[in-house]
């Protein structure tokens, strides 16, 4: 009986854990559902590819710049979409492509994957050239929208931070690139847009690359302004607004400061 009781407890614990994982971003989904802004899904087609993308529109009178949002290594999650809505709330047409489009187990995207581990493996295995092509197609699409004034910026987080830096080497119509805790490409010579970096002080893996990036950008004559937020870890923009996180003061503070800086920089587009 004791063994049976322990087994039942173990099963219930697993069910609880899985449920917690599945609902890990329920708070982001709820905020998204409560947003007063217009959202829509679009399919962007080029060649033999179809990229599923989420768009959030600002409530403004005139045309606005567009911001291309590149998701974390977890794929286009509820938080990634909620962040996209926050960018729209600041006054910009924000678009976030699901870069797992067509690669899911059922031919879909991020939502096809059973969990974050599977999505992470899939994102990690994406062909860099395909990613860049998907981002270029998305950028071309959003720039043509009637609500956009022709200006374009890119931002990315974690894995997406590195991709935003990389896109700046491939696309020369960017007004700015905002890199959140992402690493730089090896060759930065083709970059034409200013690059603004946002890093957590407790993120040694990424932070160790900053000095070399500063040197490379300086030698290439490019504008690069990194800021490190002490007490914050990797992924602080998500963790800093997650109400389920404990002992989260460093991430909360970093997110507030980074978001204030980001909005100020966006106004300069």
Regions found by a protein language model. Give the residues of each.
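Short alpha-helix in the alpha/beta-hydrolase fold that links the catalytic acid
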Residues: 83, 207-217, 229
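Acidic catalytic loop of the alpha/beta-hydrolase fold
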Residues: 202-207, 234
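Primarily recognizes the serine-hydrolase "nucleophile elbow" in alpha/beta-hydrolase
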Residues: 135-192
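Serine-hydrolase catalytic machinery in alpha/beta-hydrolase-like enzymes
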Residues: 28, 32-35, 41-144, 238-244
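Short beta-strand/loop motif that positions the catalytic acidic residue
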Residues: 197-199
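Bacterial N-terminal signal peptides
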Residues: 7-17
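C-terminal catalytic histidine-bearing segment of alpha/beta-hydrolase fold enzymes
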Residues: 218, 223-269
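Short beta-to-alpha linker loops that shape the active-site pocket of alpha/beta-hydrolase fold enzymes
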Residues: 99-103, 183, 232
């Amino acid at each position: 009986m004791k063994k049976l009781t322990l087994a039942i407890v173990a099963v219930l614990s697993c069910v609880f854990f899985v449920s917690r994982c599945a609902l890990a971003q329920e708070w982001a989904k709820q905020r998204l559902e409560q947003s007063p802004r217009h959202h829509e899904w679009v399919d962007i087609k080029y060649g033999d590819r179809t990229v599923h993308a989420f768009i959030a529109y600002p409530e403004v009178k005139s045309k606005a710049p567009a911001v291309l949002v590149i998701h974390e290594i977890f794929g286009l999650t509820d938080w990634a979409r909620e962040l996209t809505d926050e960018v729209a709330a600041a006054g910009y047409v924000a678009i976030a492509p699901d870069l797992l489009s067509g690669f899911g187990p059922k031919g879909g995207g991020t939502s096809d994957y059973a969990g974050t581990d599977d999505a992470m493996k899939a994102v990690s295995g994406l062909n860099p050239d395909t990613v860049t092509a998907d981002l270029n197609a998305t950028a071309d699409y959003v720039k043509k929208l009637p609500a956009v004034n022709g200006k374009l910026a890119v931002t990315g987080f974690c894995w997406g931070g590195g991709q935003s830096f990389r896109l700046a080497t491939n696309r020369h119509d960017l007004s700015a690139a905002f890199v959140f805790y992402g690493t730089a490409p090896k060759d930065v010579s083709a970059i034409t847009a200013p690059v603004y970096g946002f890093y957590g002080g407790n993120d040694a893996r990424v932070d160790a690359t900053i000095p070399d990036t500063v040197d490379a950008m300086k030698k290439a004559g490019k504008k690069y302004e990194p800021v490190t937020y002490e007490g914050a870890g990797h992924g602080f923009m998500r963790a800093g607004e997650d109400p389920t996180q404990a002992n989260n003061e460093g991430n909360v503070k970093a997110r507030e400061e980074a978001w204030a800086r980001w909005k100020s920089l966006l106004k300069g587009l």
